[in-house]
Structure formats: structure tokens, C-alpha cells
């Protein structure tokens, strides 16, 4: 099934300007026609006049119907919101394609996949019907649209035929509940609370600026911010931009900026915090968007299935990332169950850590988990030399937690110091570099099997560099890597066929995502800084043994998580209303 609907770029009523949810729930929305292809039958299109009759028939049999869409969130929300149609199973060829290792730079649109499989291309005349209602179209334009919609439905069906033999059956269930979190939403948003969050965030930023006696433009300008730091006696680090020019290293991701956030000088620390706060409008924008959504209906939770490259985890979409809502933050608290129903929050406790140690063969740590021992207190006791418990030693236990959770992927002492200062794993701690080195060494000495997997990852990379990916067969953490692909328990694969080695930088890279910069030179620059920038702009990221272990652990955790959700869905009919990497929120009676 494939929908065609009214849109009007002249007034901003277009998916380029607003979210899918706002577009579909808008009073301006008008379904024009629906392309349909039943199995074993000729494709056709349902006219606007025939849509009510068509869906009356479909609803009578919806418990037996499997529907195929390309970008199912869009089409399935139209089905449910406007026509109360909820089939037995929803398949999405876009979600399937995203999981099946197509080239990173290839578009996965219906038209692009049609061309890839040598299927006739799309013919919908979008340029001819923009701004036109069904009643305003002549018979010729209507025929063009109906033929194009029918062709799109046929193409989605043929693409599905090609993808299904490659796709794990269990993951089809995962796609279904991922789509329904958006197309059949369950959570209710507390509108007033979202509006209050947005107002409070604006006030917080204004108060920060007032406390410093500065204006927003002074902090958002890199040059002016650097001048303020210089006046305070802070030596500003510089970095090369894409053109090779030196600029202040004051981006959020720069290590110098992270040092400022951890500065012992409270004024410098406040300056850095305020700069990041006023440069970002994410919090109030998100709260405002959620407030608007809650006024239109239940909260449509959008996830890209396998959106996170080389981990197969979900990622955010439709201008919202539901994955990174603070678990104890005000926005989460403003998400409610429908009247007379309840929310159940289920968490796969320490899943990454458990899988990392179990798959690596670090059996002593696994046994401590099995015995119910607090592994974080155990680490802290080893580090500090006295018995640590959760009640009396929260700071020390936090460091023990950081040892277990951050050192498993090759974390070094400098990063350990900066992470401790952020208070991610417990109360913020200012560690000396030597203390961090001791903590890192403790992990590596007590997790020799995990460290061995890092080394195995390095060996695999070196072998790929020597002989290529084709014909290779390796094992990492019990998972087979054949021909450059890691084959997960579900049957999905992680793609490492793009790994390459830069001899000058002595660094491996892999194609992580689409190139975000146009006109990047085809040849690699000579200068070291320029080479790093070139790889980054081409969509590549660094890769090393411990990073491969991290990606594989997260991928295995994602598979385990989806399998658990599938079991609950199939046995009890409950699907996640919202989920994160290791947590699911269910709505129950």
C-alpha cells in the first residue's frame, strides 16, 4: 500500500517543513488516492471517493492481513488515524533495507531501491499536483496520479520479494512493534508540563547570562568567547578547520571544551556551561514539539529500525530522538498512560556489561553477577583497599561502576578522568591522572579475557588489510566474521567491508555514514590534520579492536533486547510504547 496526499510548499504544508505526525494530523491533510497490490493480483489505485468503501472491507479482515509499506510509519499512521485500520502485521521495506547492508552512500528511497533492482521507476507527478486538492484536478492529472500510486505499490511489493529471503523472520516482528509505536501510539502527553519545561529552560539560560553579565552573542561567537577566556588568563587551544585555518577549539566535542567544563575555576566552568546552554535549543525545541504533539493526540514515538550503524540499535526520527530522553527527567514524567491504564517500565539491567563478559569468556565476573554480588563495590574495594558498600560509599562505588562500564571498550586514563568529572556513573569526582591509570590497569588486570578480545579485533583488522575481506573467516566473542561481515544470532549482519588503513595516520577507518560534505576532494590530503578532516567529511570513523568489541557488544545487546520484546509481544500482545537501548515501556490494564 502506498499513499498519495495533498501538500503545498507555498504555505509550508510539506514534509520538508513539518514532521510526519504534524502533517498527517493537520486539518489540512487530504488523502488523494491509495496504491494497492494484493498478492497474486494486478496493482491498482483506490480513488478518494472509494476510500471509505475500501477500508470498510479491509477492517472486516484486518486480523488476517499483512501490509507492506515503504516507510511504514507514514502510511500506517494514515491508515490508523484516518481510517481506523490496524492490520495483523506491518512490514516496512525501508526498515528492512536499512538493516541489510546496502552501501552507506546509497539512498534507500523507493525510487532508489527500484533502480537498484532494475524495477520500473516511480512515475508519480509530484510537481503537477502540489497545492491542488482532489476536486481541483482534471481527469488527466488524476489518472497520472492513480497510475503512479499503483506503480509505487507494485514496486514496494517487488522490493519486499527481493528483501524477504535475506531478512531474518524474527526481526519482522521487531519491525512491526517499532512501526506501531508511531502508527498506533499509546502514551498520553501532559501538555502543560511540556510547556512549563520549555519556559523554564528559556529562563535558565537567561539567568545564566545575567549571572555572568554577558549577552548571548558574546558566548556563541567562537572568536569573542576565546577573547573572554584569554582575558581570564586561559590559554585557548586551537585546531585546524576544513580549510586548514586555525580556529579556537571550543566546539562541544573538543577536548579543550571538555576541560573547561571540568575547570576548578568556577567562572571558567560557568562560562563553558553557559556557552553550551545558549548555543543549543534542543531542550526547549523538543518540549515545544512534544507539547504540540500532545494537543493533536497520543504521542507518536518514531524509531528508525536498525538506525544506528554497526550496532543494529534503534535511532530517533521525525525530528525527535526518543532514545535519549532523561530517564528521571521532567519530559519522561510528562508521558502518561491512558485513563484507567498503567505504565510498566522494564529494564535489562547491566545488559552490555553482562554480554561483554559472558561472550568474552570472563567467567569470574559472570559468576559474580550470577551470585548477586555488587560488581561495582567489588571493583571499588579492589581500587581503594577497603570494603566498599552502596549505602556508605556512593562516591567510591561510582568509581567502581565506571571501571566496569567504561573500561570494557579500551578507555584510557585521560578519558577516565574527564568521564569521572562529569558524574555519569555516580557523584562527580576530580581524579588525578595517576589515579585513573591505576583504575584502568585494575580493569585490564582483572578482565584479561576481555582485553584478549580487543587484541583479536586488532588481528582481524590487520588480516583484512593484508588480504582483503573476501574469503576470510574469523571469530570475535564467539561471533563469526565471514567475508568482512559479523553474523549476529538473529541473522542480521554488521558490515566491515569498507574498512581501510591510512598508512600516514597509522589508523583504520570504516565507512560509518553518508558523506555530509559536498565537493570533498577525491585524493587524500598530505597534511595530518587535513587527512583526519578528509576522512571525517567522507563519512568515515576510526576503527580499532576495542571499538569492534564495543560495536559487537551493543549489537548483541540489541538483538537480545528485541528478542525479549518479541516474546512479550507474541505471548501477551503487549508491545513497547516507548523504548531505549535496554528499556521498554509497556501500557497495561
Segments from the language model and where they lie:
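Conserved "right-hand" nucleotidyltransferase catalytic core of DNA-directed polymerases
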Residues: 1-4, 8-13, 18, 26-33, ...
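Active-site-proximal helix-loop-helix substrate-binding element of RNase H-like nuclease domains
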Residues: 29-55, 59-164, 175, 377-385, ...
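Short active-site loop/helix that positions an aromatic residue
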Residues: 73-84, 97-101, 225-233, 349-363, ...
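Active-site palm subdomain of RNA-directed nucleic acid polymerases
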Residues: 163-175, 560-584
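Function-dense linear segments that define catalytic or interfacial modules
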Residues: 305-389
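Conserved pre-motif C helix in the palm subdomain of viral-like polymerases
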Residues: 151-157, 349, 545-566
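Metal-dependent catalytic core segments for phosphate chemistry
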Residues: 19, 28-30, 345, 352-386, ...
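Short beta-strand-to-loop capping motifs
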Residues: 586-589
Amino acid at each position: 500500500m502506498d499513499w498519495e496526499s495533498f501538500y503545498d510548499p507555498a504555505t509550508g504544508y510539506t514534509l520538508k517543513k513539518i514532521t510526519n505526525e504534524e502533517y498527517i494530523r493537520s486539518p489540512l491533510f487530504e488523502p488523494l488516492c491509495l496504491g494497492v497490490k494484493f498478492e497474486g493480483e494486478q496493482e491498482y489505485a483506490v480513488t478518494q471517493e472509494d476510500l471509505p468503501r475500501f477500508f470498510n472491507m479491509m477492517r472486516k479482515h484486518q486480523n488476517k492481513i499483512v501490509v507492506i509499506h515503504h516507510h511504514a510509519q507514514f502510511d500506517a499512521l494514515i491508515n490508523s488515524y484516518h481510517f481506523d485500520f490496524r492490520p495483523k502485521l506491518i512490514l516496512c521495506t525501508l526498515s528492512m533495507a536499512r538493516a541489510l547492508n546496502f552501501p552507506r552512500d546509497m539512498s534507500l528511497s523507493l525510487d532508489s531501491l527500484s533502480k537498484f533492482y532494475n524495477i520500473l521507476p516511480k512515475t508519480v507527478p509530484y510537481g503537477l499536483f502540489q497545492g491542488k486538492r482532489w476536486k481541483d484536478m482534471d481527469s488527466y492529472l488524476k489518472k497520472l496520479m492513480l497510475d503512479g500510486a499503483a506503480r509505487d505499490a507494485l514496486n514496494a511489493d517487488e522490493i519486499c520479494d527481493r528483501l524477504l529471503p535475506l531478512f531474518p523472520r524474527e526481526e519482522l516482528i521487531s519491525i512491526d512493534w517499532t512501526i506501531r509505536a508511531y502508527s498506533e501510539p499509546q502514551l498520553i502527553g501532559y501538555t502543560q508540563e511540556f510547556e512549563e519545561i520549555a519556559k523554564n529552560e528559556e529562563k535558565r539560560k537567561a539567568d545564566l547570562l545575567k549571572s555572568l553579565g554577558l549577552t548571548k552573542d558574546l558566548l556563541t561567537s567562537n572568536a569573542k568567547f576565546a577573547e573572554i577566556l584569554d582575558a581570564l588568563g586561559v590559554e585557548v587551544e586551537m585546531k585546524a578547520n576544513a580549510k586548514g585555518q586555525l580556529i579556537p577549539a571550543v566546539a562541544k566535542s573538543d577536548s579543550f571544551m571538555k576541560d573547561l567544563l571540568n575547570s576548578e575555576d568556577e567562572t571558567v566552568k560557568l562560562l563553558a556551561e553557559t556557552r553550551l546552554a545558549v548555543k543549543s535549543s534542543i531542550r526547549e525545541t523538543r518540549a515545544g514539539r512534544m507539547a504540540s504533539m500532545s494537543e493533536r493526540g497520543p504521542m507518536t514515538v518514531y524509531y528508525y529500525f536498525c538506525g544506528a550503524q554497526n550496532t543494529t540499535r534503534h535511532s530517533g526520527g521525525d525530528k525527535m530522538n526518543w532514545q535519549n530522553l532523561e530517564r528521571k527527567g521532567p519530559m519522561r514524567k510528562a508521558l502518561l498512560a491512558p485513563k484507567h491504564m498503567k505504565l510498566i517500565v522494564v529494564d535489562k539491567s547491566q545488559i552490555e556489561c553482562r554480554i561483554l563478559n559472558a561472550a568474552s569468556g570472563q567467567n569470574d565476573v559472570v559468576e559474580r553477577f550470577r551470585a548477586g554480588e555488587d560488581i561495582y563495590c567489588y571493583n571499588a574495594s579492589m581500587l581503594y583497599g577497603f570494603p566498599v558498600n552502596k549505602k556508605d560509599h556512593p562516591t567510591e562505588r561510582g568509581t567502581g561502576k565506571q571501571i566496569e562500564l567504561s573500561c570494557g571498550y579500551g578507555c584510557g586514563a585521560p578519558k577516565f578522568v574527564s568521564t569521572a568529572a562529569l558524574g555519569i556513573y555516580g557523584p562527580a569526582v576530580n581524579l588525578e591522572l595517576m589515579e585513573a591509570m591505576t583504575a584502568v590497569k585494575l580493569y585490564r588486570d582483572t578482565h584479561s579475557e576481555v582485553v584478549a578480545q580487543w587484541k583479536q579485533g586488532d588481528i582481524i583488522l590487520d588480516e583484512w588489510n593484508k588480504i582483503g575481506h573476501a574469503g576470510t573467516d574469523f571469530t570475535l566473542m564467539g561471533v563469526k566474521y565471514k567475508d568482512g561481515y559479523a553474523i549476529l544470532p538473529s541473522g542480521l549482519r554488521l558490515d566491515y567491508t569498507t574498512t581501510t588503513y591510512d598508512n600516514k595516520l597509522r589508523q583504520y577507518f570504516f565507512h560509518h555514514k553518508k558523506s555530509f560534505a559536498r565537493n570533498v576532494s577525491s585524493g587524500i590530503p598530505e597534511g595530518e590534520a587535513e587527512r583526519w578532516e578528509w576522512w571525517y567529511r567522507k563519512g568515515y570513523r576510526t576503527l580499532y579492536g576495542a571499538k569492534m568489541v564495543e560495536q559487537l557488544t551493543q549489537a548483541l545487546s540489541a538483538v537480545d533486547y528485541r528478542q525479549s520484546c518479541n516474546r512479550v509481544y507474541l505471548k501477551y500482545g503487549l508491545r513497547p510504547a516507548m523504548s531505549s537501548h535496554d528499556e521498554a515501556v509497556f501500557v497495561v490494564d
